[in-house]
A protein has these predicted regions:
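N-terminal helical capping/dimerization or prosegment-like subdomains
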Residues: 1-55
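Histidine/acidic-residue-rich, glycine-tolerant segments that coordinate divalent metal ions
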Residues: 99-183
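Acidic-enriched catalytic cores of C-N bond-cleaving enzymes acting on peptides and small amides
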Residues: 144, 153, 174-230
Length: 230
């Protein structure tokens, strides 16, 4: 997949393309720097995909793109091969007519996003100067709705917590101890139930300390979208 993507980038007219080896899957890098004095846009995407299981639920082979009712069905059509291909086709539309792109373009496509981008950080550190750009476009987010152009400028983050519960160290007869001795499974359920209030707000102390509050302008713009937002 990495080799195919690199070949496709060369085919559409990107002059500098290479596969950069990592301890895992290679990173595809390409650049077109023919717009002297113009800003540089760095595109990021990934060519790896989620597993296809369960196969029996697929109506068509997952790695053979199929069009049904005007929709493309294939593994990666929405995450992230479809978005990557869209940007490449936009570049091709200009370059194939002999036109210059209005901005300089750099493209980074990795093959390990679905497993945590384990080698991307080291690649970025090693290639910091090479990756210098005026703006970064992450080609890995969904459309909001049909006919609604979207610029996704943030995603939800995540955090990890470990909860350790210690119960009895030996088996206890349920007829003698059931209900009298705390069951760690039920205690854990109670703990989890208390982590959020009825409105969904997290009750863990300090959870929101570094979370930026939505601005009034953002709320105004969100309310224009065709969905409800509290």
């Amino acid at each position: 997949c990495a080799e195919w993507t690199a070949d496709e980038m060369r085919r559409i007219g990107i002059p500098e393309v290479e596969l950069i080896e990592t301890p895992g899957h290679p990173i595809v890098y390409g650049q077109w720097l023919g717009a002297e004095g113009a800003p540089t846009v760095l595109f990021y995407g990934h060519y790896d995909v989620q597993p296809v299981d369960p196969l029996d639920l697929w109506e068509s082979p997952p790695f053979e793109a199929t069009i049904r009712n005007g929709e493309i069905y294939a593994r990666g059509a929405a995450d992230d091969k479809g978005q990557v291909f869209m940007h490449l086709k936009a570049m091709e539309a200009c370059l194939s007519r002999g036109e210059r792109l209005p901005v300089n373009i750099k493209v980074v496509l990795e093959g390990e996003e679905e497993i945590g981008s384990v080698h991307l950080d080291s690649f970025i550190r090693e290639q910091k100067e090479r990756l210098a750009a005026d703006v970064l476009v992450i080609s890995d987010s969904p459309m909001f709705d049909r006919g609604v152009p979207s610029i996704c400028y943030a995603l939800r983050g995540l955090t990890y917590y470990q909860i350790d519960l210690q119960g009895t160290t030996q088996d206890l007869h349920s007829g003698s101890f059931g209900g009298a001795v705390a069951n760690p499974a039920f205690v854990l359920a109670q703990v989890l139930a208390q982590m959020k209030d009825r409105s969904g707000r997290v009750k863990v102390p300090g959870f929101y300390d570094d979370v930026r509050v939505l601005s009034d302008d953002e709320r105004v713009e969100f309310k224009k979208l065709p969905f409800s937002f509290p």
